[in-house]
């Protein structure tokens, strides 16, 4: 059944609002929040290449796997610190990104079953033609600077809305890939495992041990 564009937009908005909110569970040592899977190959010229794994609405969703529901990036930044994650520094002047190492998992319902996979499983490494190897992600913490939206200094992720990056050349995501690549086309969506567009998922972040 086809819906008018306006109704389809309302249905999409309702689905976004139903996503899990940000939860900081200090006892369990977890930060969780809801997201949804994104449409792949929005721009064919990119040939499936992505630069991010998690974006907020208004971020570069056409180069990402997951988009969050309503989320305050600053609260996420502070929430990660509450579970013991210490922010470091984005890559700069030839030095790679630094910061606490994180383990990030994606959970979703597949029929009657609940599935859970490391977030890197959703990335295809074009150099090996295999899923990205398991890594511990870096809590770099985002570069600071002027944010037009609030007319003040702050974390630039608030403006870019790209939470988790695959290349260290973008210093604005809170979380980045430990592989010190600055830019490129190495990473693509692993379509073999990514659930269909719009599937609700839960992002689970823990300090790596």
PLM region spans:
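Long, low-hydrophobicity ectodomains and other hydrophilic envelope-associated domains
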Residues: 17-209
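Bacterial Sec-dependent signal peptides at the C-terminal "C-region" and cleavage site
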Residues: 3, 7-19
